[in-house]
Structure formats: structure tokens, C-alpha cells
Amino acid sequence: VILAMKKSLRMTEGSISQKIIFFAIPLFLGNLFQQLYNTADSLIVGNFLGSNALAAVSSSGNLIFLMVGFINGIAMGAGVVIARYYGAKKRDCLQKAIHTTVAFGLVAGAALTVLGMLLAPKILVLMGTPADVLPESIVYFRTYFAGSMGAVMYNIFVGVLQSVGDGRHPLIYLIISSCVNVVLDIFFIAGLGMGVGSAALATAISQFVSALLCMVHLLRVEEEYRLELREIRFDSSMLKQIIQNGVPSGFQNSVIAIANVFVQSNINAFGKMAMAGCGSYSKIEGFAFLPVTCFTMALTTFVSQNLGAKQYDRAKKGARFGVFCSITIAELIGIIIYVAAPVLITAFNRDPDVVHYGVMQSRTIALFYCLLAFSHCIAAVLRGSGNASVPMIVMLCDWCLFRVSYITVAVRILPDIRVIFWAYPLTWGISSVIFLYLFLRGKWVYGFEKS
């Protein structure tokens, strides 16, 4: 299947459903492997190092997304610009956009490494991380960010490849890095008896491997999106476009992450068993999010390429098809998780209290995955049309401000952890109504004509 996939896909011609599905399949498989090796960290840590170490890894997840999310958002914006020029067949602009994006990634990766290592202790303390978990959380966080350049550049290179419709090569490289990560996890923790920091070290090494493989491919490919090391520099006009499209997406990621860090700090108040149980659920939720992730990526590329080629009706039809597929699959997975929650949580940790919290969160949230899928897909369509500021505003008002306000008030009225869990379905429902209105208006189709 992987070898049969084309190197790149022009979304502007051929069957709409086939183009989206053929592009989404490698994205799905790639995200599946990424989630598997993220889950491998938690499974190995939870079973070999215990609840404290599992809580440390779990508490670091939202914080890592906060630090990395903004840069990944910029990369998403860059992908929109690259896809637009690829769809319009403007080679010179395409080359400038790619090399400016890579230059940004190098600078951002260096800055992220320094900030992540310096700010780790202070932020974890502000999150209310329990004292018995804090030392291991700091070690995990600092080790991860010491190697964050690999994560940043991997996302940059994958963004370039996906924006020209190449999902095959990122998938192959991700499978390789996933295997490296799992083998190193087992070797460091089970074999050498190293601590929680070794799980982060294994992740960092595997990300460098995947970034290097992507870079070598871009340097060797004989296509208009070929990378030339001597051409890596900032082009002011391209940087402006990337920032215009990327900052709203980056800010949106940061807004979501800030809200999730706030949620995590409230969960931390219920103790390390709640932290471990909810952390286990978050790994399971990552699998449910896979169809959402692959269709959002596919939709952003599809819409951007077709609007760049001025094929407005085709962009609309593709958007409707992608949204329908995503919400259907996400809801089916949600039902499975609701039913199988006890078995799934037990795989991470057999402590009854850990299982209790994990199952409780699973059965509060899982049946509402269709709302999450819908919100993210419409946000992806808007980003692909050059309207990245619109989903940013919706996420800021709903997923951040309203979610934080709700939890702040609700927990004081009813100090039950389920009150925190309900924040997610509630805010997903509100954003879905708003995005449905924006999508049906149809003005997003002409977003590029304003820029």
C-alpha cells in the first residue's frame, strides 16, 4: 500500500474522494505510528517505573504542547502558503516559501530548546505538580527540550511534504523513527534500568532520525519543491505571508494548550492517581483523534491547493466530504472507547484508583468526539482558505476563556473531578455551532482574494 502511493498529489484534478482518501491514508498511518510510540513511553514507564513516573510523563504532555504548539502552528501556516503556490504552479514563489520556512524552523528550534530547559521548573510548579512527582517531571521535560530541534525540524519538513501532497515519505520515515523510539525505550528502561528521563531521550533521538530522513529526501528529490542548503534564508515577502497565515494558527494552538495546562493543574489538585489515570486516558484519546488529525491535514492542503487554482466548487465539495468522513469515524471510535475503557486504562496501570479516574474521564468525554472532529475540520478548512484568524478567535473565546471560566466557577460550586471533564464536551458543542454557521455562509471560499 505504502509503495503504491504516489510521491505527491495534485488535489486540483481527478476524483475528489480518491484524492482526499489517498492523501489521508498515509497521514492516518503516520499519526497511528506516532501515537503508538507516544503510548509506548507511557506503557513502559507505567509498568516498569510506577505511578509517580507515569504521572510525571502525563503532566508534561500539555506543557510540551504549549511550548511546541505555537511553532507547529506557524508550520501549518507555512504549509498553506506552500500548497497555494504548488496548486498555482508558481515555482519561484514555491521555492522561496520552502526555504524561508526551513530558516524559520532552525531559529525557532534553537529558541525552543533554550526556553524549554530554562522555564521547566517554574512552569511545572505553577501548574501545581505534586512535590513527589515534580523532580521526575522536571527531568523528563528538560531532557525532551534538550532535543527539541529534532521535533521542530521534523514538523517543518513534514509540513513541506504534506503541502505538496506527499504523505508516503513522511509515513515511511515515521515508521522507522517509531521503531527506534520503542527499541530505545525498552533498552534504556527495561534493559539498563534508567529513569524517566530516558523515555524523553528515546523520543528526542527518534525525532532527530525522522527529521534527518525527511531532510535528505528533500535534498535529493527531483521536483519543484527540492531543498537546496545554500538557498536557506529568509525572504521578507514570504516570511510576511507565513506569519500572516501561521501566527493565528500558532496562537490557536497556544490558546488550546494554555487551557489544557489550566485543566491539568486542576486535575493535579486531585492527586497523583488522578494525574496518572487522566494521563492514561489522554493517550487513548490520541488514537480517537487520529481520523480528525489526518482529515484536518488533508482538508487544509486540499482547500489551499484548489483555491490557489481558483477551483471554488471543488474546494466546497472536498470540504463537505472530508468533514463527513471525519465525524463518522471519530464517533465510531468514541463508542468503542466508551465500552472498552476499563480494559484500555488497565493496560497502562493496574492500580484501582488510576483505573477509576481513567474510566471516569473516558466515559464522560468519548461519546462527544463527533463535535471535536467537526470543530477541527471546519477550522482546517478556514485555515486552508487563508482565514486562519477566524478559528483562532473562536478557540480563544470558547476553548480558552470560556473553558477556564467554567472550570474556575464550577469546581468551587461542586468540587468533583467530573465537573472538569465536562468542560470538553461543553466547549466542543459551542464551537461546533459557531463553525457550522461560518461554514454554511460560504464566504471562506474567497479568502485568498483578500490577500
Residue ranges and their predicted role:
Residues 22-41, 143, 154, 177, ...:
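Transmembrane helical elements of multi-pass membrane transporters/channels
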Residues 34, 38-45, 68-75, 79, ...:
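Alpha-helical transmembrane segments and their lipid-water interface positions
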Residues 32, 36-55, 124-131, 187-194, ...:
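Helix-terminus/linker motif at the lipid-water interface of multi-pass membrane proteins
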Residues 1-24, 82-147, 191-247, 303-368, ...:
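Short alpha-helical transmembrane segments in multi-pass integral membrane proteins
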